[in-house]
């Protein structure tokens, strides 16, 4: 084929916040009605901290119908076609479109400030909506279920089974666990086992972090001033919080006990991977400096870095050329490119131009792996079903040939 298969590892979708009501269990709809205006107000406060409102409003002008693809399947397919994206992995949405799931659900699922029953109600509402949305084009939508696994293992197993039975193809877990046991604890073994057996990759998405430490209380009291450096601190540390669950799982022997378990780390850049792997290798190695620490390796048959290479993939959203040039250090088989539609920091509506900027001049086979091949393998996507679509919309390979650009 003379066109690339493109699979975005990072897309966001969800209905208008008020429209979640029909998907919430009836027992929780009164609570939903009370919580909705509070959620909207807090989302608006978050937008003031995380988005430059004037720039965001300007960016949205004239694009409203295309941004409706966050909840409208027909509009979304038009956007995907224009971008050359054949399939995508779908996370919940949030601040940008003011459509986060209710009750602290979504890809954050914080363990504080919400009750277990309410957070479960919000997650199940989103999962029901996502299952319907995926059904509009199951060959190109890889929907993910929100599972607030910290609260109740048995309930989590039920939610995971439901997700699998209803066409969802992965799960999202909270990256921060607060007062609950970390992911090295064996209490989660039944969860790892079912995700392995059903071949449902586990996802951690960038964003959650101790926001109040950077920006102060939210909603902010009148007259509150955000301190210098808050955003810089956040965008530096947020990747650390994203990777932290993985560190617990790697050292905890999760991938030793469950060798076919899959984990994706999404929208936290990929530039951190080489140094992270180097650190894991160093800490695993027998050295004079670690002798006094006792035996912390015998439960592992290989280094944590090797488990990473085998079991983990990185959703490299809005990937810059610098990361493409680091592809062998990161791991060519580790990278899964993503567009991050419909967020303003993503590649849309200039995805085709961004792809050329990032990948032009690199070997065709390597571009193919990063743009879609790795994701197709990770999610067991039937590429034959996508072939007619790719033949119509996929980026032409000839455009990526440029002898003047270094393939390094």
Task: Describe each region flagged by the PLM.
Residues 105-113, 221-234, 351-356:
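Short glycine/proline- and charge-enriched loop/turn segments
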Residues 95-106, 215-225:
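Short, flexible, mixed-charge acidic loops at enzyme active sites
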Residues 6, 60-64, 81-104, 140-149, ...:
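Divalent metal-dependent hydrolysis catalytic cores, especially in the metallo-beta-lactamase
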Residues 11, 85, 90-94, 146-148, ...:
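Short, well-ordered beta-to-alpha junction loops that form the rim of enzyme active sites
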Residues 2-7, 16-87, 121, 128-136, ...:
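Mid-to-C-terminal alpha-helical segments outside catalytic/metal-binding sites
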Residues 14-17, 88-90, 96-102, 151-155, ...:
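Short catalytic/ligand-binding loop motif for oxyanion handling, primarily in non-cytosolic enzymes
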Residues 118-119, 134, 140-142, 158-336, ...:
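Catalytic pocket-lining loop regions of alpha/beta-barrel enzymes
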Residues 56-61, 99-115, 154:
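Surface-exposed, active-site-proximal loop segments in enzymatic domains
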